[in-house]
Amino acid sequence: MPKMKTNKGAAKRFQKTAGGIKFKHAGKRHILTKRTTKNKRQLRPNSILPKCEVAQVLRMMPYA
């Protein structure tokens, strides 16, 4: 049987850790002047993916 392919977009966006799947919030690259300080602060921490989405991400990264 051939090797399963990893979805490279998912591999770059998500990282599997012991506590779950870590990801960085979107919308924090540029044009931040129109965003409020509160909004920028809430986007700051890396987060753990919700359990309802874990199976979808792991399917895209079979070797994670």
Swiss-Prot record:
Q: What Pfam families does this protein map onto?
A: Ribosomal_L35p
SUPFAM superfamilies from the xrefs? L35p-like
- Transport as a keyword of this entry, yes or no, is no
The record's section on InterPro entries has: Ribosomal_bL35, Ribosomal_bL35-like, Ribosomal_bL35_CS, Ribosomal_bL35_sf
Gene3D superfamilies from the UniProt entry: 4.10.410.60
Task: List GO BP terms, alphabetically.
Answer: translation
One cellular component (GO) term of this entry: cytosolic large ribosomal subunit
Q: Which keywords has UniProt assigned to this entry? A: Ribonucleoprotein, Ribosomal protein
| Recorded GO MF terms | structural constituent of ribosome
Belongs to which family? Belongs to the bacterial ribosomal protein bL35 family.
Annotated protein name in UniProt: Large ribosomal subunit protein bL35
Gene from which the chain derives? rpmI
